[in-house]
């Protein structure tokens, strides 16, 4: 049985400023760098056959910091894929969370995106709302987002003989994957930077959620 251990990238300046951060990128803050080092130390006694991330710089940088804390990972294979990028908010990239959500939902009911998630909005619905509201039509639809993530997980599942895989990902990505493979929408906070979520992959390639949001430090 394979397992995919998912952690979120370190905190960035766009996180700090409460901006929607999809395909737009920003450097890790000092807190984010320190958090990545702490995650690396928390994983010190773990063995992974593959360490992966999205191709966005904040995720790749976090992956490199985590690996730097583990000398015994020197021979571990590294990879990254665009299929596991964060949700693309299109025109609303880097908007303040409150402003972007108000524009997409055409309502001021939800101060933050996570409030809509906790109120029951699925990623299918959220993606579709941003896509419909985008004056340029660039934002991903919900089905595009979910299909892309499934493609990314298929890539990891079918990657050689790797049994234990560490994925450095993104908040919406990890939450969406937990909903897809957990079989229901999770009315929870988005994953924090210090938490781990685990997927199981059985011998038939079926993926399921083992645990969500376990604090690591």
Give the positions of each predicted feature.
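Phosphate-coordination/substrate-recognition cap region in phosphate-metabolizing enzymes
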Residues: 40-115
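Short hydrophobic/aromatic-enriched beta-strand-loop microsegments
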Residues: 27, 72-81, 185-194
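Alpha-helical packing segments of well-folded alpha/beta enzyme cores
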Residues: 35, 39, 59-62, 141, ...
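Short glycine/proline- and acidic residue-enriched helix-loop micro-motifs
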Residues: 108-144
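An N-terminal RHG(E/S)-centered segment typical of histidine phosphatases
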Residues: 1-48, 64, 204-217
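Acidic, low-complexity terminal tails and accessory targeting/binding regions
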Residues: 2, 68, 87-112, 154-164, ...
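Short beta-strand scaffold positions
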Residues: 53-54, 147, 168-169
């Amino acid at each position: 049985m394979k397992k995919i251990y998912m952690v979120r990238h370190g905190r960035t300046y766009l996180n700090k400023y409460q901006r929607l951060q999809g395909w737009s990128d920003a450097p890790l803050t000092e807190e984010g760098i320190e958090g990545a080092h702490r995650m690396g130390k928390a994983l010190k006694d773990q063995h992974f056959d593959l360490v992966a991330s999205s191709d966005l710089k904040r995720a790749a940088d976090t992956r490199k910091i985590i690996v730097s804390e583990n000398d015994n990972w020197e021979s571990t294979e590294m990879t990254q894929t665009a299929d596991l990028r964060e949700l693309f908010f299109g025109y609303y990239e880097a908007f303040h969370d409150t402003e972007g959500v108000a524009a997409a939902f055409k309502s001021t009911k939800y101060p933050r995106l996570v409030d809509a998630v906790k109120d029951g909005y699925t990623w299918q619905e959220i993606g579709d709302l941003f896509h419909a509201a985008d004056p340029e039509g660039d934002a991903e639809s919900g089905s595009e987002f979910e299909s892309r993530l499934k493609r990314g997980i298929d890539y990891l599942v079918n990657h050689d003989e790797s049994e234990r895989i560490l994925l450095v990902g993104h908040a919406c990505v990890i939450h969406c994957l937990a909903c897809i493979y957990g079989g229901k929408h999770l009315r929870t906070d988005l994953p924090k930077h210090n938490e781990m979520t685990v997927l199981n992959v059985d011998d038939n390639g079926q993926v399921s959620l083992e645990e969500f949001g376990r604090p690591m430090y």
